[in-house]
Regions:
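Internal alpha-helical scaffold of NAD(P)-dependent oxidoreductase catalytic cores
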Residues: 46-50, 112, 133-224
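Short phosphate-binding/catalytic loops that engage adenosine nucleotides
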Residues: 31-32, 117, 164, 204
Length: 240
């Protein structure tokens, strides 16, 4: 089975920073957005701005109508959501169920899988703003894909259709993966906040803009260094 075999009817549960963006990317690849759930006024506004043609529907209706259900909810809410929908026999055989939580693999989708649903855990390694700018950033983003081996090509195809690069992460490695994501995100925010605070105290206007080029180039250089083969030693007099 391949996500490229035809257009999927996609339902999105959660209109936070991630769900509408992934929905927009998949809609751009030719899939149909059946509906999206949104509770707060802020999430409704976000859904309407990013997916203006997608109706805002109740969760059971979305699950009933969708071939692919994207669960873009906070990690803490995911287990209860999956179990609750299983308790009402909402999941269907052959239906794709995809969650975006970094800290979970597909085990959390076991209640849906028991009813015949096909589980996928796909996490984009990106700090989302929840605005349309994120759609363009997907093209430079790696996605962690966790799924049973026969299902991995589906997850990889969906990532490619969203413009990203897929990398397989084993079920047992999801906790370590989530830790790495949290460290990178929290550290970056903490350091930037500390540095901009110091600049503000000494009277530098717009400290975020002042540090933008420095922070981006420093991070790029650090990432480039981690990708450098250890076997390559710089020649005397050369500065890589």
């Amino acid at each position: 089975m391949s996500a490229r075999a035809g257009r999927l009817g996609i339902g999105i549960i959660g209109a936070g920073h991630v769900g509408p963006i992934l929905g927009a990317a998949l809609a751009g690849a030719g899939h149909a957005i059946i509906g999206i759930s949104a509770v707060s006024d802020e999430s409704r506004d976000r859904a309407e701005a990013i997916l203006p043609s997608a109706p805002i529907l109740d969760i059971p209706v979305i699950v009933e109508r969708s071939e692919l259900v994207i669960l873009a909810v906070p990690d803490a809410e995911l287990p209860a959501l999956v179990e609750g929908l299983a308790a009402t026999s909402s999941w269907r055989a052959g239906q794709l169920v995809l969650h975006t939580a970094a800290g979970f693999g597909t085990a959390v989708l076991a209640p849906a899988q028991a009813l015949g649903a096909i589980p996928l855990a796909i996490h984009p390694a990106m700090d989302f703003t929840g605005t349309s700018i994120d759609i363009g950033r997907l093209g430079e983003t790696w996605f962690a894909v966790t799924a049973p081996v026969p299902v991995q090509p589906i997850g990889q195809a969906l990532v490619v259709e969203m413009g990203g690069e897929p990398v397989i992460v084993a079920e047992n490695d999801r906790a370590a993966y989530a830790e790495a994501i949290e460290i990178a995100t929290a550290f970056s925010r903490s350091i930037v906040a500390q540095a901009t605070g110091i600049l503000s105290e000494i009277g530098v206007e717009h400290p975020g803009g002042f540090l933008s080029s420095l922070v981006r180039s420093s991070v790029d250089n650090a990432l480039r260094e981690t990708s450098r083969p250890e076997s390559i030693e710089p020649l005397d007099g050369e500065d890589f």
